[in-house]
Regions:
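Conserved phosphate-chemistry cores used by DNA topoisomerases
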Residues: 1-176
Length: 176
């Protein structure tokens, strides 16, 4: 069977994966699949990656913010501290940054499965709030090249890839 793009109904294929490394691997596999077997969909700009948040920051009064990376979370905390200081709040430097920012809780999402249906809708699916990244041909080509290198028949490519990156491995981020 061959793929016929004229049968594409909604003109958007949205890939939803977790915000962690495992989710990135799955997205790479799916982009490679579309690039290899349904290239017209990629070339036509129909593939999107949904970007779920990694953190939920909560403060009193039902105030909440979503952060999509560790860096964004840290920046939000710093901005909240600065805002509180400029509004005259007394900040105890001995308190945790979370408390200094006036936050009650910081929740890290380990995956989409940890969100209830309302959270998933509000953060990742609701058109007004969601963050979508359109996959470009270059993205799919890069994913295909990495996939071929890591999963292909040529052991020497995989070995070289691992050897050049092993020294940069962050063992704290390994999911073991």
């Amino acid at each position: 069977d061959t793929f016929d793009i004229s049968g594409l109904r909604y003109h958007r294929i949205i890939i939803m994966t977790d915000a962690d490394v495992d989710g990135s691997h799955i997205a790479t596999l799916l982009m490679t699949f579309f690039f290899r077997h349904m290239k017209e969909v990629v070339e036509g700009g129909h593939i999107y990656l949904a970007k779920p948040p990694l953190y939920l920051l909560k403060a009193t009064g039902n105030k909440k913010w979503y952060a999509y990376s560790d860096e964004e979370k840290d920046n939000m905390i710093s901005e909240l501290i600065e805002k509180r200081q400029s509004n005259g709040a007394k900040i105890n430097p001995n308190d945790s940054p979370m408390k200094q920012a006036g936050l009650n809780d910081i929740q890290r999402y380990k995956g989409l499965g940890e969100m209830d249906a309302d959270q998933l809708w509000e953060t990742t699916m609701k058109p007004e709030n969601r963050v979508l990244i359109q996959v470009k041909v270059e993205d799919a080509e890069r994913a295909d090249a990495i996939f071929s290198k890591l999963m292909g028949d040529e052991v020497s490519l995989r070995k070289s890839f691992i050897q050049t990156r092993a020294k940069d491995a962050n063992f704290d981020e390994l999911d073991v």
